[in-house]
């Protein structure tokens, strides 16, 4: 297929149309790295902490930071090349990056994104069968809301592995989700200032 980019010029009525394939052919296949290109320990991104002990503080991460989430995706989320991963996290949270993008892409996993203003279990639950989502991560509160919606009404057979983080996991939520799906919720703990710190990884009980 042919990708097109439409650029609007606010000054006049003209619209520029670019053919992606044609533009791509104009670039060299050899990547030339500039000497002053950012890498290694150079700052890559800054998160703000939640500010539980005062004002939010900046947590700066280097270009090495995404590599730490290979473990997150491979051994906690268990993403795979043939799978589709869904992490529910607002993009304002660090979990959106380390739960949706860095490790998941490093593991060659596809990422499912669903935009909503307010979480509604009855909207999310049909997505698993419709799009064949294979790995899933959400906070325990969302699992509770899904259980209240009655998991038995939905086909969740595509899910191979389920994880949770963000707050303490209630044993009753664990039990009810297990009874409905046969899957054990694998819990993890991370912080804005670091990667996934403590978790039930693959092979652990």
Kindly give the residue locations of the regions a language model identified.
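Short beta-strand->loop structural element characteristic of the AMP-binding/adenylate-forming
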Residues: 1, 57-60, 87, 110-117, ...
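Short beta-strand elements of ligand-binding domains
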Residues: 2-11, 17, 164
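Conserved pre-ATP/AMP-binding loop-to-beta segment of ANL
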Residues: 6, 16-48, 55, 78-84
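Conserved structural elements of the adenylate-forming
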Residues: 27-31, 59-80, 94-95, 143-148, ...
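Conserved S/T- and glycine-rich ATP-binding loop of Class I adenylate-forming
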Residues: 43, 49-52, 85, 128, ...
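Short hydrophobic "strand-cap" motifs at the C-terminus of beta-strands
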Residues: 46, 88-89, 114, 139, ...
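Conserved AMP-binding/adenylation subdomain of ANL enzymes
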Residues: 67-84, 91-134, 149
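Gly/Ser/Thr-rich phosphate-binding loop
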Residues: 106, 133-138, 147-205
């Amino acid at each position: 297929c042919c990708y097109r980019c439409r650029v609007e010029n606010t000054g006049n009525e003209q619209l520029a149309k670019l053919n992606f394939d044609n533009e791509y052919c104009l670039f060299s296949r050899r990547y030339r790295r500039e000497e002053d290109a950012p890498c290694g320990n150079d700052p890559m991104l800054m998160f703000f902490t939640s500010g539980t002990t005062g004002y939010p503080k900046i947590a700066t991460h280097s270009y090495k930071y995404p590599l730490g989430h290979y473990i997150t995706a491979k051994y906690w989320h268990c993403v795979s090349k043939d799978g589709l991963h869904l992490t529910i996290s607002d993009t304002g949270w660090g979990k959106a990056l380390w739960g949706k993008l860095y490790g998941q892409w490093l593991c060659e996993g596809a990422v499912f994104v669903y935009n909503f203003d307010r979480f509604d279990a009855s909207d999310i639950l049909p997505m698993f069968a419709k799009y064949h989502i294979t790995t899933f991560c959400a906070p325990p509160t969302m699992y509770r809301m899904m259980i209240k919606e009655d998991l038995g009404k939905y086909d969740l057979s595509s899910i191979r592995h389920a994880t949770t983080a963000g707050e303490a996991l209630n044993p009753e939520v664990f039990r009810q989700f297990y009874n409905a799906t046969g899957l054990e919720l694998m819990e993890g703990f991370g912080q804005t200032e670091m990667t996934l710190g403590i978790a039930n990884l693959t092979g652990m009980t």
